[in-house]
Structures are given as C-alpha cells and as structure tokens.
C-alpha cells in the first residue's frame, strides 16, 4: 500500500502543480491549459508530467497533426488570384487574345502564364487555337474549392488538415501538386490525463509550498534553515542501469597474474607464436617420434614451412642429448636425431619454449614469466579449445630447489585466493615433477590447475645452464572458468553481452 503523504512530500513543486491543475476536472488537459492555470512554463509542465508518468500518476498521450499554411507565393495567389483566374479576367470583353498579349494584360511572366494556361484548360475555362486564347463562356467562372481554400488560409494563417471539409481536402491535393503554394508540416500534440493513483494523491490533499533548493551560509548562520521546506528524498526510486565499458574478464585475469609475478620480482618475457620444432620440442628433450608432435596434436605451418636453427654449438648439444644423453650421464632417447624435423615451423603448443629461449640468452640467477597464446589441435568442446592462454615461469639459481618451487607456487595461488596442494606427476622435460591442485569449497573438491618441476639436465646442459632451474605452467582459461563459475570454456569467447555486463567491474581481482 502506498504511503500517500510520503509520496506527496517527495514530489517536486512542479509535479504538485501539475496534479493541482486537475482539481475539479475529470478530463485530460493540454499542457497549455496546465501552464496557464498554474503559472508555470510549458517546458516545466512537460518535464513534471514525464516524471509523474514514470510513477504511474498521469498518462501523457501523444498525437500528431498535419497543419497547412500558405507560402509567400501562396499568399500572393490568395490576394491577387491564381494565374488562371487572372487570365480569365483579362479575357473579359475580348473574343480572343494572342498569348503574349494576354500574359501582359494579366501581369504574368512567361512561366506563370504557361502554368495559368494549363489550369485554364484543365478547369474548362478557356481554349487555345493557333496561338490564340479564348474563353469558353462569357460568364465569369465561379470560385473553385482551391480558391476558397486559399482565402481560408489567408484569413486564418494555418489550418489543421483533419478539420478541413472533404471538398477542401480535395482542393488541397491540387494545391500540393502546384509546388510552392502551400506548406504542410507535422505538429505534435500532447494531452495529460490523471490516473487513478494520481487521483488518490490529489484527494489526499496537495499543498503548494515553496521549496528550498539549497542551504546557504546565511541560512545556517541565522538559523533560517530550520523553517525552510525541503523536498523528501525517494530512496526507493528506480535508478537507470548503466553499462560502462569494462575490461574483458580474461584480460583482467591475465593482468592479475602479471601483477602477481611482477610483485614477486619476476621479469616478463615474450616469444614468437610461430616457433621452430627445435625450440618447441627438441630443446625440451621431447623425442622426435613423441605423440605430441603428430599432426593430430600440433599445427604445422605451411608458410614458412621451415625456420632457421640457432647456433651450431647449441644444435649439436641438443642432438647429442637426444641421441646419447651427451655429458649428462643419461642414455638419451637412443635414435638418430633429424635436423629437418627440428626446422619445421609450428604454432607453439606451450610457452615453455619462451623459457628455453630466455635461458639460452640470459645468465642465472633469474626469475622470468611469460603469458601468451598457445595452439593445439583440440576438438572444440565445453572444456577444450584449439587456442588458449598459458602462463609459464622459471626460477634459476645456485640455491634453487624443488622446495623453493613449491613455496613460489603456494604464494602465487594464495594471491589468487586459492588453497593449493601438490601431487607427484610426470612431464618429459622436468624431474622432480608435480601437479598443482586447488580446493573449491563450494564443491568440496580439488581440481588440477597446472604443472611444475625441475628442468632435467638434458634440457639445461645443451643451453649452457649449470644451475638448477624450477619451471611451472598454468592454463589461464581454466582458471577463468573457476573464477567466474563458467561450465563451458567457449563462453569466454562468445559475445554474450548479458553475461559480460553481469560480471563485477572489480572486487575479486587484484588489479
């Protein structure tokens, strides 16, 4: 039930005046009538009526009218007569006249005379033969509907078309065809009607009291503010929904991850998306017959199909590691390593190749991370995409060990807001290796969210690195699915404005 007194107190003074205008009236009112009775301007009436309509107290009905008026030429025709009328008047007492002489007597120029002759014949008032014009009858033709309409418009200035009788509407059609005589424009009409709810407010009693729009220093100093009337605030009023520009949620998480690693003292690095198999696979001690290299798992680039290998010393060291284990003490993979296979161009399948490049170019101690897109020939499903983002990182130094790695990962996941645990795992290029699992309290379950380990000697020695190196990797889309409670990974790349607008602007992200 409405609190009528509270609502009335919250109304603007102009809204009250619009309602007061309906006292003693059950009919809709024009804005002009309200403005005149309440001594306010039309603009204020319309503004207040719009506010009242939004709350259901009045209805603003809109209608459009077409209004016809005379142009400057039309006024001339109304005063002096249409060209055909002036021609027929000039023919009075004459059996016939040559066209130029008739035009001169009628006071018409060549163009006006041509128009007049056409209408003279169309109305059946005259005829033309061998350049001579004559009247059909000795009697002066009666004024037509078009002439009566011109006279009416000259007298009244403008007329609503819907108010014209049918005869004059037909004449208006003819005058519209004679360009430049009449002007037709649309005007909007508004009427305002009081609703049942508005009538309840009016019957409750509305008092018009001037409101204070601001409290000045003088009001405060003199105490006059205590006697001023203030309009109440409507804290229940509906507010407009605002859809500001927002950063995409995936970009927000990437920025959050970047921020965490930068605060932990890491350096950011990037690498090419089109990579050689050498950096993507061989450098990481992945054999050339490994299943991950198959066409069904990796995108091979057609152009350029091959890339240059790095310096010969590095290539030879990687070859030795694969074939015999080199100087690492390992037996390697015991096969004949092929340079042509290593030169093949691929879309990188992980960002670990960035770590390999970084280690080959920089001396430990170091801490590096990289965020970028990776590509795998995955069938698109609710949890797999052929293109996604990955964050990769390494820590290298004499004192770096597996326990340091676990500590860094624990701190990283803590900053993301997750409890983490570690389970033993296997990866081709790390040993010891672990999988990171985070706990989801709402599901009371653990979910795998990344892998990590210590780079094997077969990876490090060819790169010339003599210190231990800890490495880790994480799929960012999977993290986004958990963070935003998404069941289908494809949602991250669909233009679902409803979902995007519903996400919080800030809050759980450390930006």
Curated annotation (Swiss-Prot):
It catalyses: tRNA(Phe) + L-phenylalanine + ATP = L-phenylalanyl-tRNA(Phe) + AMP + diphosphate + H(+). It comes from Methanothermobacter thermautotrophicus (strain ATCC 29096 / DSM 1053 / JCM 10044 / NBRC 100330 / Delta H). It is found in: Cytoplasm. Belongs to the class-II aminoacyl-tRNA synthetase family. Phe-tRNA synthetase alpha subunit type 2 subfamily. Its EC number is 6.1.1.20. Its cofactor is Mg(2+). Its main location: cytoplasm. This is Phenylalanine--tRNA ligase alpha subunit. GO terms for cellular component: cytoplasm. Tetramer of two alpha and two beta subunits. Keywords: Aminoacyl-tRNA synthetase, ATP-binding, Cytoplasm, Ligase, Magnesium, Metal-binding, Nucleotide-binding, Protein biosynthesis. L-phenylalanine binds at residues 352, 390-392, 429, 455. InterPro entries: aa-tRNA-synth_II, aa-tRNA-synth_II/BPL/LPL, Phe-tRNA-synth_IIc_asu, Phe_tRNA_ligase_alpha_bac/arc, Phenylalanyl-tRNA_Synthase, WH-like_DNA-bd_sf, WH_DNA-bd_sf.
């Amino acid at each position: 039930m409405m609190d009528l007194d509270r609502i009335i107190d919250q109304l603007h003074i102009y809204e009250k005046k619009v309602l007061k205008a309906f006292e003693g009236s059950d009919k809709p009112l024009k804005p002009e009538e309200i403005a005149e009775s309440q001594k306010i301007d039309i603009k204020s009436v319309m503004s207040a009526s719009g506010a009242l309509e939004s709350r259901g107290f009045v209805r603003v009905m809109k209608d459009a009218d077409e209004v016809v008026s005379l142009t400057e030429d039309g006024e001339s025709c109304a005063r002096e007569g249409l060209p055909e009328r002036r021609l027929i008047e000039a023919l009075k007492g004459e059996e016939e006249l040559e066209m130029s002489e008739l035009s001169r007597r009628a006071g018409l120029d060549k163009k006006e005379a041509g128009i007049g002759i056409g209408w003279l014949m169309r109305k059946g008032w005259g005829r033309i033969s061998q350049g001579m014009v004559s009247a059909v009858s000795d009697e002066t033709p009666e004024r037509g509907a078009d002439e009566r309409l011109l006279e009416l418009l000259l007298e009244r200035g403008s007329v609503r078309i819907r108010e014209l009788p049918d005869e004059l509407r037909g004449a208006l059609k003819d005058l519209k065809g004679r360009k430049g005589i009449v002007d037709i424009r649309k005007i909007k009409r508004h009427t305002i009607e009081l609703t049942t709810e508005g009538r309840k407010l009016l019957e409750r009693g509305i008092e018009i009291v001037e409101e204070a729009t601001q409290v000045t220093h003088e009001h405060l100093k003199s105490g006059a503010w205590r006697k001023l009337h203030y309009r109440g605030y409507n804290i229940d009023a509906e507010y407009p929904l605002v859809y500001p520009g927002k950063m995409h949620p995936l970009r927000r998480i990437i920025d959050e991850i970047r921020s965490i690693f930068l605060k932990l003292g890491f350096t950011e690095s990037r690498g090419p998306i089109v990579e050689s198999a050498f950096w993507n696979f061989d450098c990481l001690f992945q054999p050339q017959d490994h299943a991950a290299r198959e066409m069904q798992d990796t995108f091979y680039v057609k152009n350029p199909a091959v890339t240059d290998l790095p310096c010969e010393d590095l290539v030879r060291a990687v070859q030795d590691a694969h074939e015999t284990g080199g100087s690492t003490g390992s037996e390697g993979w015991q096969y004949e390593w092929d340079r042509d296979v290593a030169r093949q161009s691929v879309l990188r399948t992980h960002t670990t190749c960035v770590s390999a490049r970084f280690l080959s170019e920089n001396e430990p101690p170091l801490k590096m991370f990289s965020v970028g897109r990776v590509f795998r020939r995955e069938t698109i499903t609710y949890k797999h995409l052929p293109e996604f983002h990955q964050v990769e990182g390494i820590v290298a130094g004499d004192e770096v060990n597996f326990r340091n790695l676990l500590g860094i990962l624990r701190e990283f996941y803590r900053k993301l807001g997750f409890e983490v645990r570690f389970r033993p795992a296997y990866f081709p290029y790390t040993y010891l290796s672990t999988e990171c699992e985070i706990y989801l309290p709402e599901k009371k379950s653990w979910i795998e969210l990344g892998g990590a380990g210590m780079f094997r000697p077969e990876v490090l020695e060819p790169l010339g690195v003599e210190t231990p190196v800890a490495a880790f990797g994480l799929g960012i889309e999977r993290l986004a699915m958990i963070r935003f409670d998404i069941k289908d990974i494809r949602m991250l790349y669909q233009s679902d404005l409803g979902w995007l607008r519903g996400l919080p602007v800030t809050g759980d992200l450390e930006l």
